[in-house]
């Protein structure tokens, strides 16, 4: 009897501190901070569960001087169980000055995805299946796009990083991994509570066909333009604590801890995420106060 293996795993890598890592999901963000921004992140998800996701992300984006263009490069490595997913992306954005306050950016993303399966990590009975003998690695290109409205206090965005719905191992009728489009909607607003305290509520909504709706809501405080503290809630999934510190004008570090609210909490001690953002300022763009996203 023939058996067809069909899978739909976690699609794009998951982030709790998405508000600082927007370039990975929305190409229109490229250059929007007005400086060269270098970002690195590591996430260990569901600690204590064997084969749980681990993610490493790196990105660089910058505006092009004397133009409305921005460019970006990013790399994401996402490991889940026996799978290893590497994505390299290039982003280009074009920004229109809508008013003295608001800018609207349009972006496109081109990416290449390298997906591999380590059969040595599979159950021996599964790994020995003749139908999986030709399954090792796969490469697929993709295209994405996004829009991003922003000011010094507000941002709203909509994006689809992966328009092409590729089937991994399509030449093997017994082992099919179907990618799906991920639709992202993000937003946030910064309120000045006092000269030394800022408050920013924010949200991210991710829509994937055939998967539950993901809604992340967060609330963060920034004290003296230095210390960030906050919390977040992922609908029916997790609650999070967030912290960050502006070490210098150009260096910002952050950490978040997720505690599961599902049955996974009985098997996992939570998820950890750390990031570092380094920015290079020129004489014109010298930072007066840090932008809170």
Task: Map each language-model feature to its residues.
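N-terminal signal peptide c-region/cleavage motif recognized by signal peptidases
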Residues: 4-6
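Subset of outer-membrane beta-barrel
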Residues: 10-293
